[in-house]
Amino acid sequence: MRVQKYIKKSIISNIYTSFVHHFCPMMKIFKTQRALKEHLSSIEEKLVVGFAPTMGSLHEGHLSLIRESKKRCDIVVCSIFVNPTQFNAVSDFENYPKDYVEDIELLKSAGCDVLFLPNDVDEVYQNEKKVSLELGNLVNVLEGEHRPGHFDGVMRVVKLLFDIVQPDKAFFGLKDFQQFLVIQKMAKVLNMEIEVLGCDIVREENGLAMSSRNKRLSNTELKNALVLQK
């Protein structure tokens, strides 16, 4: 009797596994531009490609971008790349939280199809063709005023990633609202045929906007940060 139950359970398990692999193919991970481009070039032109660039240390806010992309697009691409050119302090770059193993599992669970996880900085910047963009006060006020050069670094890396992935739609969280406007403006100025979409802020139970850097805050700092939502 136990053997029969085991066999029955195994058959059901095998059927389920086959179903998952057929209808829910595993996420593909690429570490080089070349391999990623080759894969994306094999996708039918009529399929809509969505893209969500991240710096990793993923949370529910990032995953909401993947799910929104899944709703609107046929293929969902995500990148994890901690971009050094947008950090003002070396220590901030070096201490940025990283957990690629967990990030990969989270992306799989959210339904991501393709992950670009470059080996190093040169893998992203190797073919850069620098473009001078003047966006005026949009990049000089608020965060731009307190972090000189930050948005230049953001635009550089996002343009590179757009050039590599060639998405139809790109998804960004509205938590970084100024950054969203900068990227949207950049795409328009450069005549990129990419629809830059903003997605709603995802918050913790206490109302604080989810952020990868939240884990670096002390309990007191987390409490003080709640004033930002008022």
Model-inferred region functions:
Residues 2-4:
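Cationic, amphipathic, low-complexity segments that mediate targeting or membrane/lipid association
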Residues 22-23, 27-230:
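Nucleotidyltransferase catalytic core that binds NTPs
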Residues 6, 11-23:
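Short, positively charged and aromatic/hydrophobic N-terminal segments
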